[in-house]
């Protein structure tokens, strides 16, 4: 996990490593408790591991660590988000949390899935395509 202090931060030195997904999950819940003044002040996170002493850029990515995330915007579930996600992703373990720009009128959220291994940089594009094929459909736009 690489953390960025805001959308304007591109320094990659703030890393957190976890022994398992449960530890990562616990950290996600702790991050969710951090207050922020506006969306621009919200902490950002990436599954990417970057080359040492570089900035946030695709050219500096070494791999994705043991998790991935799918952003979901413009999703209409008739107030039954939990039920829809449980039905669509019952076979997967995941964490769902709202993003900084989410509102009751326009919910936006992220689904975070554990991976069984890291994704080397050369496989990220293929993995991303497969992940989006797997998660899109009638339940997720």
Placement of each model-derived feature along the sequence:
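Signature for HUH/AEP ssDNA processing cores
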Residues: 1-107, 113-125
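Hydrophobic, well-ordered secondary-structure segments
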Residues: 124-128, 132
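Flexible helix-coil linker/hinge segments at domain or subdomain boundaries
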Residues: 132-141
């Amino acid at each position: 996990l690489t953390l960025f202090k805001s959308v304007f931060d591109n320094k990659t030195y703030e890393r957190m490593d976890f022994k398992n997904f449960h530890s990562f999950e616990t950290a996600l819940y702790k991050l969710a408790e951090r207050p922020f003044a506006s969306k621009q002040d919200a902490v950002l996170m990436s599954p990417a591991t970057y080359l040492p002493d570089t900035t946030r850029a695709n050219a500096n990515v070494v791999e994705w660590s043991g998790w991935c995330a799918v952003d979901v915007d413009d999703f209409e579930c008739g107030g039954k988000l939990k039920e829809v996600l449980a039905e669509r992703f019952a076979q997967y373990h995941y964490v769902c949390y709202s993003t900084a720009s989410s509102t009751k009128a326009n919910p936006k959220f992220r689904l975070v899935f554990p991976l069984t291994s890291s994704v080397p940089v050369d496989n990220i594009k293929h993995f991303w395509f497969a992940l989006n094929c797997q998660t899109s459909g009638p339940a997720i736009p």
